[in-house]
Amino acid sequence: MKKKIKIFIDGACLGNPGPGGYGVIICGKKLYKEISNGYYLTTNNRMEIMAAIIALESLHDMYNIIINTDSKYLKNGITKWIKVWKNNKWKTNNNKSVKNIDLWIKLEYLSKKHFINWNWIKGHTNNIKHDRCDFLAKISAKNPNAIDKIYQKIKNF
């Protein structure tokens, strides 16, 4: 039987685009881990997806996971839209290129290693762990130390 854990994630951006960050909390039996980082120039949606990627990359075993996010973009993207996008050769229903393809591909790959229940939670409603992720994401956005190379390449920075 796979071990059970809960993951809380959040992304933030000071301006959109602008400096951004993510916050992650992973918790289970005998496990509590916080992860955060900030980027000089990115978007809020990229930070939401990045939070999920970083959380999954930090796991070394297979898990039964509940990922809690306040991003409907992330939840719907990975549970519904990605199938349509792939069938449409990474085009939306309006025939536009899907944004953040690099991150969606990576997230889908990492997600296949676990059984994941993607849970949407309303943000800023006194959920202690999610509020902590929000804090970590905002602090990281205020103190960036990394470059979102793909985003900056797309935007020609």
Curated annotation (Swiss-Prot):
GO terms for molecular function: magnesium ion binding; nucleic acid binding; RNA-DNA hybrid ribonuclease activity. Its EC number is 3.1.26.4. Its main location: cytoplasm. The keyword Disulfide bond does not apply. It is found in: Cytoplasm. Keywords: Cytoplasm, Endonuclease, Hydrolase, Magnesium, Metal-binding, Nuclease. Binds 1 Mg(2+) ion per subunit. May bind a second metal ion at a regulatory site, or after substrate binding. Mg(2+) 2 binds at residues 10, 134. HAMAP family: RNase_H. This is Ribonuclease H. It comes from Wigglesworthia glossinidia brevipalpis.
